[in-house]
């Protein structure tokens, strides 16, 4: 029995194939570029993430019986924005967690609402990305 782990990170998609004892039996990494269209901005194409998964999973399973995969777990970078249209198509590059274009708005929220109050209301901190 095997389990697949997929990590859609900021710089790459990392895939692991783990056996039932928890040992890593195969791993694959597909890097994708960061886009910096303006100073302080940080974006990526969500299509690159999907391509990395679609390409990476068959590579990960090469030489292994896919029928023995019992589960898949995935995780990814947090605090990003993927804008979709009404048909769920991506309409622009994703704005990443490390994008700084809204730092003035974050400062405003922290000053007017307060960091602690904002965190208690949203269960999160205000983030520029």
Where would I find each of the regions flagged by the language model?
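Glycine-rich phosphate-binding loop and adjoining helix at the ATP-binding site
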Residues: 54, 82-129
